[in-house]
């Protein structure tokens, strides 16, 4: 008995890959913030003020990035925190904020403070740790963008010039 000849070509299968959505660079995030900051009429009606703490609302999210609105009464602050490996940018639309930038938990770094006035945008990479504060006497409103969307944030305290990790919050806990 003769067996039929098979002409099936052997195929090599490519290794399985995980598709990771492209992320935006700090510069691209700053551009997204700028676009929203110049059109407050499109979102200003959503802003609220809260004496209990900063008010915030996520106004955009997709696989690449997310955007938040945040309002700040005088004296409100974030405390030192990172962005869980996400890059970011923020811009002040109304009022003024003050940003205190620190190093990393592994590296001692002098804290630097810089004013961020209306119209100014700050952008940063994925290992950035900072504390943003409203040290003025007026309300402030800011726009924040992160890529990839925030999955977690770690909070820190500055003790004797070194960052000490306090806790990590996952998305949905804030």
Task: Name each model feature, range by range.
Residues 1-41:
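N-terminal leader/capping segments at the start of a protein or of a new domain
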Residues 45-76:
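A short glycine-rich, His/Asp/Glu-containing loop-to-beta-strand
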Residues 68-83, 125-127:
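Conserved short histidine dyad/triad with adjacent acidic residue
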Residues 74, 85-103:
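Glycine- and acidic-residue-biased ligand/ion/polar-headgroup-sensing regions
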Residues 79-81, 99-100, 124, 130-135:
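Short beta-strand His + acidic residue motifs that chelate non-heme Fe in jelly-roll/DSBH
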Residues 89, 103-130, 168:
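Short acidic-glycine-tyrosine-enriched beta hairpin
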Residues 117, 126-152:
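Ligand-binding loop in jelly-roll beta-barrel domains
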Residues 145-174:
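Conserved double-stranded beta-helix
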